[in-house]
Amino acid sequence: MGKEYGLVDPDPVETPGDEWDEIDVSDTEADRIARERDREFDQFRERLTDADQFKVEQSVFDDATLAALYKLVQDGHVEAFGGPLSTGKEANVYLALGPDETSVAVKVYRINASNFRQMREYLEGDPRFEGLGGKKKDIVLAWVKKEAANLDRARKAGVRVPRPIATERNVLVMEYIGTDEKRAPRLGEVHVENPETAHEVVREYMRRLYDAGLIHGDLSEYNIVFHEGQLVVIDLGQAVTVHHPNSRAFLERDCANVSRYFGRQGVDTDEDALLKYLTEDSTDSA
């Protein structure tokens, strides 16, 4: 990452308050579509599962997931599907074509393969999910809704994150961060010639998240990407509210990861100083 790119400072915006809307995880329209299996859905299902880029990913696309993708197409959020951008144990991310020929990212969570016990640990204590049951499907659907809500809240707080577009069951559609050729590189994948500036931006993003009542929970050089002169924070699915019983431990871990990375880049920083900066005189407190 060369100096010619520069790093833009985040635009100051009014941070959201401490209100948290309850998130519904009841059956979706996709569940109904999967149950009824009409002819149009069956045709869509056959086309998608026969596509070359999806033939090796059959475990991801059960009927309910295909119904969710079908509903997203019907609603105009997705017009065509491309190949995978990344694959993981719990979710795959695919490039897709959205309205007006814009590229979007489609994140598909595997309900059967997801570590729902770990997911539940992040959901418990979140006021948006009070009374959430123990069903695996409900946990994963809540996680998808949570990721979209976290992205939306972070954007309102002035943090550069992918814009959430739509959710349907275990699928999240969001802004694609990258070029026609490839996804944006992670901070840990590039040479940073201006690490002090990058550190200041990341520190400010962490502060804005905290002031908005959120803690990333897994922040490191691998959950920050560089795109068009900006640092973009990604993977907010596990982000918790400051009211979460483990919020302090998650915040301390984020501070340790960020300080360790920038310390290796020659920046004079330490996790205690970063933690103090984030929490002292904040508009919220853990």
Task: Enumerate the predicted regions with their spans.
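A short, mixed-charge helix-start or loop-turn motif at secondary-structure junctions
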Residues: 51, 131-137, 188, 240-241
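Active-site acidic catalytic loop and adjacent metal/ATP-binding pocket
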Residues: 88-97, 164, 201-238
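Short acidic, glycine/proline-rich loop/turn micro-motifs
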Residues: 119, 184-189, 243-245
